[in-house]
């Protein structure tokens, strides 16, 4: 699950990114609204061609590959992917600043490293690794494979042969076909959204503040501490993961199965598994997200599943395995889906209402009122004028965007039905015709609320295409069609985020668009290769193993539900699902209507949903990370503000990168020499 980019609340959708800790405004030497450092003055900005450099592309490829491995690991274990944009911007700065420092010491002439180049590298790297989770490798595409087909069990919609096993050719071709068109759909409206409407795009603004802060004297001083912190915890995390590997030579072995709170709690997945990836993720996420995941684990594994399991033989047959969708696992999956859909439904209507209201207000005003005065701050006014001029000069012909979008529509309408015979060419045409309208609504809403609704549009499309295609073709058509719509809508919103970052860092839109295309092209190759490496090396999709990949089965069951309706649900599951849908909807409403001092204690239904399938161990890991940040902020808040992202990135990257050599060892049939297992005393 990759919770979408958001600043205030986490989780309107299940595949997106988790909210992060952002630097407190009082600790930054910048105004977040303008992202302008006091030390920055009007400057000569390089042309867009000079902003896209060979060293930058190489750095983006390396960062994109590293984060693709990390994101893929998270997507195939819990599916809860944290927002890594700030971490990627930090890595881009550290890589290029380190490179230029080495050249300086060697006496080699080099071009200066600017914030514009930093922004381009971050954009390119993020575009690369976004394909790893946005492309559906841990959800919809995984839901197409034979193992997930078998786990879904026998049902009229889950017809024999309704699966497509992973392969590099069709996967790379499919994500390439659906990833580029979204970048073109809203280019003609970029000035309207960023300059005329002055949409904030909070995540894009936060990234710009960070990048601008790097390129100051104080930022350079802080960067040295961040480099040391990152390298220290990267090394610690990598060595610890390497050490743990020696003790995992069998089933249910190693520190990842350490019964921290006793064997009884361990059986209910309550233990600390020493995963530094999720400790780092917990440091990036807000305290509320982490506590919400723990509450979800307690509610599900501590209360619900033990109670429902006692109904074996009455609510569901006693002679089928618990992993069957007709057994306990069916309740786990559909109650999780109910929480996701309840939270997503509320946020869909919320963002739709906010968007319509804001557009109506803007259309009723004169255009001149859209330009806000700077309160007499002449320097700020000059900065804004320079930003607007740079952003306007880097134009991209509207006719070229329209022509490119039309050409990609035709290509996709030809290619995708060849990959999936269940997807008709007119399904693709309908998706491409509706995508610009949905993309504008989503991009506008994201600019106001920082909530990316692409995953909700994708789920709606999944149900529509599944029902439209009918029983024999519905599952495949729903999974492929939902991925298509989601990616088209998400790409345009992500590009607007990057344009906002570029506007505030005085980066040319042309260089950002080029970076997006380069990064997307790299991601279309890197993501399938990374996925296939993991898929062949590990037992992906095993409900009782480490690599649970829960969202593959969730999305397949959504498609089955779209074809068959509620008849597919186990006994009493519909009533329970309706209750949890209402629970999620009411809690989401409460977060918006209650006073701030009370609303901040209302748990997030989306974050609560994840442990329903994957267990509570990762929630404990994330709470450990949250506790570390809490203590650090109490001891030295100023240091914690700029060191937490570096330390968290080091923990995530070290543990995540170890997955790459461990998968190579697994493919080479080299097994760990020791199995450390815990059993009750005699």
Swiss-Prot record:
Chief localization: membrane
UniProt keyword list: Ion transport, Iron, Iron transport, Membrane, Transmembrane, Transmembrane helix, Transport
Record has Hydrolase as a keyword: no
Induction summary: Induced upon iron deficiency, but no effect of copper or zinc starvation.
Protein's GO biological process: response to iron ion; seed development
Observed effect of gene inactivation: Plants display leaves with yellow stripes. Iron-phytosiderophore transport is increased at low pH and inhibited by the proton uncoupler CCCP.
Keyword Ribonucleoprotein listed: no
InterPro entries, alphabetized: OPT, YSL-like
CC terms in the record's Gene Ontology section: plasma membrane
GO MF term set: iron-nicotianamine transmembrane transporter activity; oligopeptide transmembrane transporter activity
Top-level lineage group: Eukaryota
Membrane protein topology class: Multi-pass membrane protein
Record field: transmembrane: 56-76, 79-99, 124-144, 167-187, 236-256, 288-308, 334-354, 396-416, 428-448, 460-480, 514-534, 549-569, 574-594, 612-632, 640-660
Tissue: Expressed in roots of young maize seedlings. Not detected in leaves of iron-sufficient plants, but accumulates in roots and leaves of iron-deficient plants.
Cell compartments where the protein resides: Membrane
Region (Disordered): 1-36
Function: Involved in Fe(3+) uptake. Acts as a proton-coupled symporter for phytosiderophore- and nicotianamine-chelated metals. Capable of transporting either Fe(2+)-nicotianamine or Fe(3+)-phytosiderophore. May transport iron, zinc, nickel, copper and, at a lower rate, manganese and cadmium.
UniProt similarity note: Belongs to the YSL (TC 2.A.67.2) family.
Name of the protein in question: Iron-phytosiderophore transporter yellow stripe 1
Source species: Zea mays
Encoding gene per record: YS1
């Amino acid at each position: 699950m990759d919770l979408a980019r958001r600043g205030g609340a986490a989780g309107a959708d299940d595949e997106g990114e988790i909210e992060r800790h952002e630097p407190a405004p009082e600790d930054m030497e910048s105004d977040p609204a303008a992202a302008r450092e006091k030390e920055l003055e009007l400057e000569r900005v390089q042309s867009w061609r000079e902003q896209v450099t060979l060293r930058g592309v190489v750095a983006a490829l390396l960062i994109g590959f590293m984060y693709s491995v990390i994101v893929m690991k998270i997507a195939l274990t819990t599916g809860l992917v944290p927002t890594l944009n700030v971490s990627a911007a930090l890595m881009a700065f550290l890589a290029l600043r380190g490179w230029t420092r080495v050249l300086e010491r060697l006496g080699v002439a080099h071009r200066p490293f600017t914030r514009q180049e930093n922004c381009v590298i971050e954009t390119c790297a993020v575009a690369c690794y976004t394909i790893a989770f946005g492309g559906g490798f841990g959800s919809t595409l995984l839901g197409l494979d034979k193992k997930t087909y078998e786990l879904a069990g026998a049902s009229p919609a889950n017809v024999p042969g309704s699966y497509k096993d992973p392969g590099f050719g069709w996967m790379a071709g499919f994500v390439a076909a659906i990833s580029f068109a979204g970048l073109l759909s809203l280019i003609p409206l970029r000035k309207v959204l960023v300059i005329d409407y002055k949409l904030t795009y909070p995540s894009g603004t936060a990234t710009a503040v960070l990048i601008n802060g790097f390129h100051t004297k104080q930022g350079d001083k802080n960067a040295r501490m961040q480099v040391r912190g990152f390298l220290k915890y990267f090394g610690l995390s990598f060595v610890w993961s390497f050490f743990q590997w020696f003790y995992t030579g069998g089933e249910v072995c190693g520190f990842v199965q350490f019964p921290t709170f006793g064997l009884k709690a361990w059986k209910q997945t309550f233990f600390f598994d020493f995963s530094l990836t999720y400790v780092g993720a917990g440091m990036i996420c807000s305290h509320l997200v982490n506590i919400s995941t723990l509450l979800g684990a307690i509610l599900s594994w501590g209360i619900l599943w033990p109670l429902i399991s006692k109904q074996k033989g009455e609510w569901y047959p006693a002679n089928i395995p618990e992993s069957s969708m007709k057994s306990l696992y069916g309740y786990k999956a559909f109650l999780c889906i109910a929480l996701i859909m309840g939270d997503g439904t509320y946020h869909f209507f919320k963002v739709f209402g906010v968007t319509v209201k804001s557009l109506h207000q803007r259309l009723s005003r004169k255009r001149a009122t859209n330009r806000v005065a700077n309160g007499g701050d002449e320097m700020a006014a000059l900065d804004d004028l320079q930003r607007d001029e740079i952003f306007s000069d880097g134009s991209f012909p509207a006719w070229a965007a329209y022509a490119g979008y039309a050409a990609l529509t035709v290509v996709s309408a030809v290619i995708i039905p060849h990959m999936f015979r269940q997807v008709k060419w007119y399904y693709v045409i309908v998706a491409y015709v509706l995508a610009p309208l949905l993309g504008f609504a989503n991009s506008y809403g994201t600019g106001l609320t920082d909530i990316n609704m692409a995953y909700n549009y994708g789920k709606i499309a999944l149900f529509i295409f599944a029902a439209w295609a009918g029983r024999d073709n519905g599952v495949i058509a729903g999974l492929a069609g939902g991925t298509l719509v989601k990616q088209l809508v998400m790409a345009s919103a992500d590009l607007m985020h990057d344009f906002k970052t570029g506007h505030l860092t005085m980066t040319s839109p042309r260089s950002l668009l080029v970076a997006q295309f380069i990064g997307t092209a790299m991601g279309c190759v890197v993501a399938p290769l990374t996925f296939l490496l993991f898929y062949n090396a590990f037992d992906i999709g095993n409900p009782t193993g480490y690599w649970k990949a829960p969202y593959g089965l969730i999305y397949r069951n959504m498609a089955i539900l779209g074809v068959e309706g509620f008849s597919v649900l186990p006994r009493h599951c519909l009533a329970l699902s309706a209750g949890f849908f209402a629970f999620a909807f009411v809690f989401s409403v409460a977060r918006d209507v209650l006073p701030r001092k009370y609303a901040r204690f209302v748990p997030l239904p989306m974050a609560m949903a994840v442990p329903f399938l994957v267990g509570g161990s990762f929630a404990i890991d994330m709470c450990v990370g949250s506790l570390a940040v809490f203590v650090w902020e109490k001891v030295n808040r100023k240091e914690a503000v700029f060191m937490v992202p570096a330390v968290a990135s080091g923990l995530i990257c070290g543990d995540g990168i170890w997955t790459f050599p461990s998968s190579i060892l697994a493919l080479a049939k080299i097994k760990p020499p020791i199995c450390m297992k815990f059993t009750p005393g005699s």
